[in-house]
């Protein structure tokens, strides 16, 4: 089996980002981004997706977190697209429900080749530890656009914003794990009746 790894660099006037992933990893993660709450959430993707992630970023954090959060999503999406290759043999679809105390979120993903995001998370607060939670929409939009996936994110219950976000990222990691997993019965086959994704 070919290694499903990728390294991507994104260099703009706003951010400089390096991301490396291993889709067949063990959940190892290393981050140097400068946005602690984002790093905490990315760790959920790695651990629950069993995907090795290594991301470094230097950005205009003196302005705010927006460009860094969005560009990390873009770069991670590019890395996924590169690592997954032609998509032959993958399960393609993934889904997960994850609870955390009172919060419950559902994430469904399709490596369809068609970018689309439906995100319905009624945050109960605007910030967590100084982090603007609206930026997670920018993160996921960047990921979707560059991984070329359809992604549905719904928080079904929850009153604690930290719990809402954490359940989203844990479910996202688990859905990714399911979708990128190789299916022995589909070896070498495209998971689409069109023959292409």
From Swiss-Prot:
It is found in: Cytoplasm. Keywords: Amino-acid biosynthesis, Cytoplasm, Histidine biosynthesis, Lyase. InterPro entries: IGPD_sf, ImidazoleglycerolP_deHydtase, ImidazoleglycerP_deHydtase_CS, Ribosomal_Su5_D2-typ_SF. The keyword Lyase applies. It comes from the Bacteria. Pathway: Amino-acid biosynthesis; L-histidine biosynthesis; L-histidine from 5-phospho-alpha-D-ribose 1-diphosphate: step 6/9. One of its GO terms (molecular function) is imidazoleglycerol-phosphate dehydratase activity. GO terms for biological process: L-histidine biosynthetic process. Gene3D superfamilies: Imidazole glycerol phosphate dehydratase, domain 1. Its EC number is 4.2.1.19. GO terms for cellular component: cytoplasm. Pfam families: IGPD (PF00475). It catalyses: D-erythro-1-(imidazol-4-yl)glycerol 3-phosphate = 3-(imidazol-4-yl)-2-oxopropyl phosphate + H2O. Belongs to the imidazoleglycerol-phosphate dehydratase family. This is Imidazoleglycerol-phosphate dehydratase. The lineage of its organism: Bacteria, Pseudomonadati, Pseudomonadota, Gammaproteobacteria, Pseudomonadales. The gene is hisB.
């Amino acid at each position: 089996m070919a290694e499903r790894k990728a390294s991507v660099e994104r260099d703009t006037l706003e951010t400089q980002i390096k991301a490396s992933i291993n889709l067949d990893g063990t959940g190892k993660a290393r981050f140097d981004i400068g946005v602690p709450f984002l790093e905490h959430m990315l760790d959920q993707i790695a651990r629950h997706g069993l995907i090795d992630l290594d991301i470094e970023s230097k950005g205009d954090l003196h302005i705010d977190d927006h460009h860094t959060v969005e560009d990390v999503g873009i770069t991670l999406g590019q890395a996924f697209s590169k690592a997954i290759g032609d998509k032959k043999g993958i399960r393609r679809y993934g889904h997960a429900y994850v609870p955390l105390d009172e919060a419950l979120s559902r994430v469904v993903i399709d490596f369809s080749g068609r970018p689309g995001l439906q995100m319905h998370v009624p945050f109960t607060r605007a910030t967590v530890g100084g982090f603007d939670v609206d930026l997670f929409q920018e993160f996921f939009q960047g990921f979707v656009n560059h991984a070329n996936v359809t992604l549905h994110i719904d928080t079904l219950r929850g009153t604690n914003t930290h719990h809402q976000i954490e359940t989203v990222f844990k479910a996202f990691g688990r859905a990714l794990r399911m979708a990128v997993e190789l299916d022995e019965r589909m070896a070498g086959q495209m998971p689409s009746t069109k023959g292409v994704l």
